[in-house]
Every structure is written in structure tokens, then in C-alpha cells.
């Protein structure tokens, strides 16, 4: 089974221009989980949150995530200033589901095994998890030619070291688009970056 770990940086409100969703797909999640545990213990933390880390701490974690070349990193960033239909931003769950479909497409389309998708439970309303699962399954089975099982679940990030790792990655990507800080972003090995809306992003 292939597992997709999802976390985001920013929000879908009007405060900041960009919103980022990052996806980590590890070949060996145990390696990442182990060094995340060590990092938490060494720094006296209860949970890793990208916004609360120092730059050296973020550098350390990003280096560890990349070091074995066994984790695929992808992301989608949305330019909220160029969303033409305001309804998409009024219903944040619909917008979130829509963005995730672009982020998941290539991974699910080329997978030859069951897929598990795990999100932070602070991301969407609990009652919306079923609508997300149904939406992704419809896309996968009717448009992407996927023939295996898909499970969508959510957990509190404090219980998932992989979600915490995704948070650090999302934070580094967010800093690039919001603050123009490329230092951490350039240390990431990005498999796929999606800028939405496609033709007018950043204009």
C-alpha cells in the first residue's frame, strides 16, 4: 500500500495571497518517523510544527527528509487573488477537495497498489471527510483509470510524525511564495509543483 501524507501552510481565507498543500509519499516511512522522534526528544518538543522551529532546525529536518532519496515530495500552491469564482473561496472544503484532486492525480494515476491518504484532522471539518473520499474516488475510478482501493483518513498531527514532516515541508514552500525566502525551498527535492490557477498564477 502506498500512503500519501498531507499537510498545508496558510489558509483559504483572504489574509494571505497564497495557500500551500504539501504531500509526502515515503518508500520507508519508518526512517523518517525514527529521526522525527529523535529530533523531538533532543529538542524537548511535544510535536514538530514548522512555524515554531528555528531556521537551523528546519534545515536539519529537511536534510534528513531528503538524505536517502526515499520520499517523494509534491505540492500545490493556490493564488487566491486570481480565483475567478468567489464561490470556491466561500466554501473552503469544496476548494480544498478541488485542489487535492490536482495534487493526487499523477500519484494515483500511476499507482499499481492500494492508496491510503492521511490528513491532519485540523485541515477539514470532520463531517467533510466522507465527501473528500467520495470526490477522490470518483475522480480516480472514472477519470484516472485507477483500479485499486482508496482509503481516506485523518488524524491529529501530534500522533503522526509523517504529518509533522509534511508540515515542515509545507512551511518551507509557503515561505518561498509569501516571503520570497528560497533558502529552505531550494534544499527540497520536489517531484511535482502545481501552481493554481494554471495560466494566471502570480499575475
Predicted regions and their residues:
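Phosphate-ester processing/binding pockets and catalytic centers
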Residues: 1-203
Amino acid at each position: 500500500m502506498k500512503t500519501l501524507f498531507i499537510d498545508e501552510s496558510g489558509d483559504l481565507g483572504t489574509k494571505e495571497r497564497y495557500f500551500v498543500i504539501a504531500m509526502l509519499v515515503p518508500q520507508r516511512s519508518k526512517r523518517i518517523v525514527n529521526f522525527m522522534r529523535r529530533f523531538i526528544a533532543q529538542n524537548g518538543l511535544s510535536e514538530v510544527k514548522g512555524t515554531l522551529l528555528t531556521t537551523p532546525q528546519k534545515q536539519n529536518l529537511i536534510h534528513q527528509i531528503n538524505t536517502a532519496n526515499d520520499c517523494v515530495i509534491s505540492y500545490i500552491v493556490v493564488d487566491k487573488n486570481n480565483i475567478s469564482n468567489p464561490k470556491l473561496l466561500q466554501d473552503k472544503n469544496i476548494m480544498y477537495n478541488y485542489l487535492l484532486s490536482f495534487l493526487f492525480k499523477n500519484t494515483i494515476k500511476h499507482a499499481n497498489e492500494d492508496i491510503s491518504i492521511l490528513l491532519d484532522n485540523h485541515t477539514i471539518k470532520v463531517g467533510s471527510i466522507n465527501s473528500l473520499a467520495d470526490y477522490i474516488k470518483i475522480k480516480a475510478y472514472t477519470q484516472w483509470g485507477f483500479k485499486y482501493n482508496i482509503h481516506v483518513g485523518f488524524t491529529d498531527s501530534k500522533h503522526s510524525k509523517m504529518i509533522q514532516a509534511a508540515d515542515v515541508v509545507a512551511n518551507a514552500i509557503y515561505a518561498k511564495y509569501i516571503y520570497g525566502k528560497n533558502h529552505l525551498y531550494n534544499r527540497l527535492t520536489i517531484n511535482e509543483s502545481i501552481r493554481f490557477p494554471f495560466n494566471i498564477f502570480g499575475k
